[in-house]
Amino acid sequence: VEVIPFLCFGPGFRSMLYLVGQCHYGPLIVASQSNLPVAQATDTSEDARIADLISRMSVERKVAQLIQPQINSFTAEDMRRYRFGSYLNGGNGGPYGNEYAEASEWLKLADEMYLASVEPMPGGEPVIPTMWGTDAVHGHTNIIRATIFPHNIALGATRDADLVRRVGEATAVEIEVTGIDWNFSPTIAVAQDDRWGRTYESYSEDPAIVAPLGAALVEGLQGRKGDPNRLGAGHVIATAKHFFGDGGTDQGVDQGEVTGDIEALKAIHAAPYPAAIAAGV
């Protein structure tokens, strides 16, 4: 194996600064002889920029960048004080404690959190805009009157990558108008046991079907590589989730153990990730 220094970061839409939250510092160990893509070293100029930002941050700010609170557990004043790197709306969570809030209320909260996150910091600490992430797996389903699309198990039955791409495009527009930057989707789990309670989130038990459909949703949400408007207006950040093997846990236990020959497991459960990466996730 080879050891590659690894730093993960994602761009926020409202700033030229890069998000320091959601990062892992340290080595990433990857197989040097593998049919999976090898991690690429980050750009040295970006490395230097990030190192400069981190060097000017207090321990408290660094910790806050790694925390992703749920919207019903904190306020804009808390954001102003702690400067969380990102936040999310979880199940049944809505702005100001109202899960049935109109889209305008979601946008209002997004603006409040963003403005709180970019207020000047004391002592010259860098200002890093926060990000809001949501689970819009088959449409922006947390919002009343948003479009709800068939779930992944049904879209997988169509084998229609263009249809899935258009679902992503429509979903991105509806997410953006509520002020949210980031979608926790696509789910590229390859379900192997129907007892798993999230089987409906999987496009198929066949990785050859999951891979192109997951990549298509990435393109729909973010825009295609080479498109000058990629990650611009009408687009949001995508996420290939959840983790290697989540669709193949023993007896279908959610977030359970995955056992078996590693090469056989990789052939099934790792296969969709290179396609999502190639699509720009």
State each model region's role.
Residues 1-3, 20:
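Acidic, Ala/Val/Gly-enriched low-complexity intrinsically disordered segments
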Residues 6-7, 27:
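Composition-driven detection of intrinsically disordered, low-complexity segments
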Residues 7-15:
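Low-complexity, intrinsically disordered Ser/Thr/Pro- and acidic-rich segments
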Residues 18, 22-25, 33:
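Low-complexity, intrinsically disordered or signal/transmembrane-proximal segments
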Residues 29-281:
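Glycoside hydrolase catalytic-domain context in secreted enzymes
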